[in-house]
Amino acid sequence: MKLLFLDIDFFQAIFLRSLVSLPPLLILALRAKSLLQKYSKKNKRLIIIRILAEIGTTVTFLTALKYMPLANVTAIAQSLPLAITMAAALFLGERVGWRRWSAILIGFTGVLIIIRPGLAGFNSYSLVALASVILLTIREISTRKLDSEIPTIAVAFSTTLGITVFAALSLIGSEWVEVHITSWLLIIVAASAVTVATLLGIVAMRTGDISFVSPFRYTSLIGALGLGVLFFGEWPDGVTLLGAFIIVFSGFYSLHREHILSASK
């Protein structure tokens, strides 16, 4: 998407990516007959919350991605497992001990190191990236709260449809940019990746152990560092690497403590 933003409008790119993602999701949803099911008010409310959170996440994360180095955005996003732990304690009544609270505070210190508020290296879009983490947390918690009988494909389709409609409305009054073959290839790649990631992410959050699933998020930081250097010549500085290390270390420690507590029950 970062490459795509160099050629076409922000919301046009989001619209086309979501539009390409819709047909395969619709086919899967129709085959599973998941769109004909009736859902409880609770599940309808959670799905709506998830759609709104996903729209907000898409806009904030991709805005930060457009204007910030790839590694910086990804490093800030690594605070998500810590944010989920904090949200679970505050809103779901999950018991979090002082060690995990300490890990959360240290992890967000790493975020502040990357953001560098008030310093010369401060980028205001870092705050936009941080907002995406908050919205991602809302999305993940709402996903986790959905009843197990709600089909994953229905959640994925409704979310993608919501983003498509939102992006289409955002394009009203703007000039449509001609899309060349290279951009179409990027759109197809992005749509394929986000479709698979959406489905797997929903399944993982609903059926997997969060302490097992969350560490896999940290592997994206390695990929982001490599892609940033390869495609954009973005070499992360020492401060960014330090902040990223603190976030990842704190996240693993928090998940380690969660595993110990789960094993003792």
Please provide the spans of the model-predicted regions.
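Cytoplasmic-side transmembrane-helix entry/capping segments in multi-pass membrane proteins
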Residues: 41-51, 96-108, 125-130, 149-161, ...
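Juxtamembrane helix-entry segments on the extracytoplasmic side of multipass membrane proteins
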Residues: 7, 15, 39-43, 111, ...
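C-terminal transmembrane-helix exit sites in multi-pass transporters
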Residues: 61-63, 80-102, 222-241
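Hydrophobic/small/kink-forming positions within alpha-helical transmembrane segments
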Residues: 26, 51-59, 81-86, 111, ...
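Hydrophobic transmembrane alpha-helices of multi-pass small-molecule transport proteins
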Residues: 99-116, 239-258
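Transmembrane alpha-helical segments that form core, pore/gating elements
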Residues: 2-3, 10-11, 25, 120-179, ...
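Helix-helix packing/entry segments at the starts of transmembrane helices
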Residues: 73-79, 146-161, 198-230
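Membrane-interface interhelical linkers
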Residues: 22-49, 150, 161-189, 199-209, ...
